[in-house]
């Protein structure tokens, strides 16, 4: 079973919510998404958190190891590919158990750039 690393911000940092959405997901560490900032964007029905490129900024993220089934559940939750798209990155991940830093290939959900800026809903 192939596992991938997912970087989370916002509601997907909530351990209880992630357990409900992705029962096999495992917290493995933390990192920072450098050169990005958090902001709310959305649609007529509401605004949601996303990340967007912004030089000099940084977003702290949690890192989850997810199975293919977990990733499919996240795709549904995030409205992929219509509302959010996935971006692949390589980031240094600080392990929860060991504190060691290792570079890992990760994916993150980012709202499409054409979505208007909004306020939390």
Label every model-predicted segment.
Residues 1-121:
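Glycine-aromatic micro-motifs
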